[in-house]
């Protein structure tokens, strides 16, 4: 099977390990066929959250992927086709799944949803951050051989839709920069303070790879996060509080996707 997946692969941007796909084949990480996935995908990190969104918010749901238990579903939300698929944790995982969705499944828009840790007094527990841009300690951009430092940013149309919907539904949302880190258990005690001094709102682990993939492939991306932990004072949400806060973010992401789709982008 691996040999057949390699035959005929001629993409200019060949993956590091040589995997590829033919025009009528799934990727090594996704069993979906062409047309199974909507133009807009909501991407939580947790596969069970992807299932929860599909079960709770979408109609006429069809599962298109369960490879490595990374669940993917397509359904209908308020008359608009929307897919939801998990990304896993970290930039390498997000990098793989978002790249394949953009490149091989003709997805145009990805909205990343997840949790983040606040490092700013501008956002506290339960608040939602809309990431206009993302700094990173990752070397993900090294593959592009750029002569400088790239600044990954969100698509303004998606960002504007999300911000307007947050005001409409009375959801507390702050627009600003986040930082994507490769390290969850950071040994540097000054890490968060240094980024906070630059006005960064929160720390997370995926958005830089998503934004860079979108830029490289001329697609659209937005990341939004619920603040589940305040890294400045040590406070955090309970399991029940996290679910309630995440529901607000899920609704915001779905309404953003719907408005963006019916409006043809902004």
Task: Walk through the language-model features, giving the residues of each.
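N-terminal amphipathic/basic-hydrophobic helices that include classical n-h-c signal peptides
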Residues: 1-24
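Glycine-rich beta-alpha junction loops
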Residues: 47, 117, 179-184, 209, ...
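Flexible, glycine/charged-enriched surface loops at secondary-structure junctions
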Residues: 59-66, 170-176, 261-266
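Active-site rim beta-loop-alpha module in soluble metabolic enzymes
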Residues: 152-198
């Amino acid at each position: 099977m691996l040999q057949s997946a390699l035959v005929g692969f001629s993409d200019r941007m060949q993956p590091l390990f040589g995997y590829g796909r033919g025009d009528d084949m799934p990727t090594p990480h996704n069993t979906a066929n062409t047309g199974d996935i909507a133009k807009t995908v909501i991407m939580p990190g947790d596969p069970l959250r992807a299932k929860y969104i599909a079960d709770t918010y979408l109609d006429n749901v069809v599962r298109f992927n369960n490879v490595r238990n990374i669940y993917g579903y397509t359904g209908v939300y308020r008359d608009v086709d929307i897919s939801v698929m998990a990304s896993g944790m970290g930039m390498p995982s997000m990098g793989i799944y978002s790249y394949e969705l953009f490149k091989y499944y003709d997805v145009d828009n990805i909205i990343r949803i997840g949790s983040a840790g606040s490092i700013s007094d501008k956002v506290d527990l339960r608040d939602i951050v809309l990431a206009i841009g993302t700094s990173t300690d990752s070397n993900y951009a090294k593959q592009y051989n750029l002569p400088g430092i790239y600044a990954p940013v969100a698509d303004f149309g998606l960002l504007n839709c999300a911000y307007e919907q947050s005001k409409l539904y009375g959801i507390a949302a702050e627009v600003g920069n986040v930082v994507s880190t490769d390290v969850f258990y950071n040994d540097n005690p000054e890490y968060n303070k240094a980024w906070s001094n630059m006005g960064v709102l929160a720390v997370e682990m995926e958005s830089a790879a998503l934004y860079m993939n979108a830029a490289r492939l001329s697609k659209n991306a937005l990341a939004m996060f619920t603040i589940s932990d305040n890294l400045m004072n040590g406070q955090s949400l309970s399991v029940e509080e996290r679910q309630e806060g995440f529901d607000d973010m899920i609704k915001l992401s779905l309404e953003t996707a719907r408005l963006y789709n019916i409006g043809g982008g902004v």
